[in-house]
Regions:
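Compositionally biased terminal segments of proteins
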Residues: 1-201
Length: 201
């Protein structure tokens, strides 16, 4: 039997979250490849609303898939404000799960998430961050680690989405997370290289 693909691994987690009725939204490269440059990714970041009463149900459902996740790791993630992992030991695939905090940005991300097709082969859908929120979080991640991949992903989203983006929303949250300078540089570069008319920001 052929081993599962990363998309199949991700799909099994998405289907489980939906079967449990948990509110979630997917960000990271998984979402940016939908809005920007389509490419294979083995990186999925899922933000979920996980009441304490649902933690054990989630653990049991994920373990039934044959994946590793433990209640202690979820509790630690809650206390330390860090993600926990869901791991398929057979393939080595991993998903990073972020517990949604009661912050204005996290709440905005959930409210603005949208159901999108993430696999054109199967037409599978999931709730993804909006493209604007993908940009904001990639700005945050860039400031944390200075990885150029985040800037490339943002650039691809700008090129593909163009004037469909809410630039005022991005500017507001870029300021809130301390990324205004980086955002303005990316926007200026986009304007220089794009053949489209400059967005009204």
């Amino acid at each position: 039997m052929a081993s599962k693909t990363y998309r199949e691994f991700a799909a099994s987690i998405i289907e489980t979250l939906e079967s449990l009725g948990l509110q979630y939204a997917i960000g990271g490269s998984f979402a940016s490849s939908t809005y920007g440059e389509a490419r294979t990714t083995m990186d999925i970041d899922i933000s979920i609303v996980l009441p304490e009463s649902e933690m054990q149900r989630l653990v049991e459902a994920i373990q039934q898939l044959g994946y590793y996740v433990f209640l202690d790791s979820i509790v630690d993630a809650l206390i330390q404000n860090m993600p926990f992992n869901i791991i398929d030991a057979t393939s080595g695939y991993k998903a990073d799960i972020f517990l949604v905090a009661p912050t204005p940005l996290d709440q905005s991300v959930l409210a603005r998430s949208r159901r999108m097709v993430y696999d054109t082969t199967t037409n599978a859908t999931a709730r993804l961050y909006s493209p604007e929120d993908v940009i904001i979080y990639k700005l945050k991640y860039f400031l944390m680690g200075r990885s150029q991949k985040h800037l490339r992903d943002i650039g691809a989203i700008l090129i593909v989405q163009g004037t469909a983006l809410d630039y005022g929303y991005i500017a507001h949250w870029a300021q809130e997370v301390g990324a205004t300078e980086v955002w303005n540089q990316l926007l200026a570069e986009y304007r220089r290289t794009s053949s489209q008319s400059s967005p009204d920001v």
